[in-house]
Amino acid sequence: SKQILILMTVILVIILGGCTYVLNKTSGQIYEQMSQMAQLYAQELDNRFLRISRNLFSTIMDTNETNSTFWGNVNLMKNGDYSEYAIGKLREEYFSSAWEYGTEYRIFLYTHDTDKLYQLSLSSDGNYTMSSDIAASIREQIDKLDEKTYAVKRKWDVLECDNEVYICKIAQKNGIALGCIVNVKSILEPFSKLSLGKHGYVSLVDQDEVCIGMLDQSGIISEPQSMNTKNTYTIRQGLSRAPFEIRIGISLGGVLSLMAGSLLGMTVLIFMILIMSGILLFHVYSNIMKPLKVFTQ
């Protein structure tokens, strides 16, 4: 019986060692997959930001304004009798942006002469409405920009309105401002279904290391808190087209949750191996060792 106990212990140690190796290998693969996912999403965001910036820049800085559809409609707006017609035409120009960028990216136009702001792209509700608070925040941001060519080259800025955080890109020329605004919630939303554990999070951090948006297991946090990096494995992925960085913190609970299938499979495997080993050893003891012991006595 002593030999059987030793043999069972050796088998158990070998099994546990193998399981530990598999778990470490699996957790490493999970971290690598999460890192690749963050990289792919950052590339998608960079591509989207680049296309939006190019559209704003090329449209507002069109040197041949006489042949520009955009400037033709903008100039038509100066005639009060045709302003509604001109806005309708501009909205037709940006109708496809809802599919190209997503309805969460809202294109807007602001005219200094009339102090009016119009949303040109379609919202998710099928309208062109923008809250007065957001419009006021955009006006304040436009006032901060100098009326110079380099203003269109500035990177995405952060706006706060009604406990919500937005990022905004604005290009302006000759008293006309053309821009795009998006809620940070929409940027973090694709990560909402990830299982990151109790202390896990996804955040958007600016170049000053300030967290401007955070998502944890409870959902989007309107007032981002300090990130718990002690109990998490942190993945950092910077954006090249905007001064922000995506950070993903995965806690031990999140890793175990993502490894649930592997853990369940290994538990069943260990249980089956132990049962089979026990049956085999009992058979060896009953049919070989016990008769041999009786014979030697």
How would you label these PLM feature ranges?
Residues 1-32, 268-271:
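Extreme N-terminal signal-anchor transmembrane helix of membrane signaling/transducer proteins, especially
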Residues 32-138:
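Extracytoplasmic/periplasmic sensory segments of membrane signal-transduction proteins
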Residues 87-103, 173-212, 217:
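Solvent-exposed, extracytoplasmic
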Residues 119-130, 151, 201-206, 210-235:
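GAF sensory domains
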Residues 120, 128-139, 160-194, 247-251:
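Conserved beta-strands of PAS-like sensory domains
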Residues 169-186, 230-271:
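Short, hydrophobic beta-strand elements of compact beta-sandwich sensory domains
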Residues 266-283:
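Selective detector of the "anchor" transmembrane alpha-helix that sits immediately C-terminal
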Residues 282-297:
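Membrane-proximal alpha-helical signal-transduction linkers
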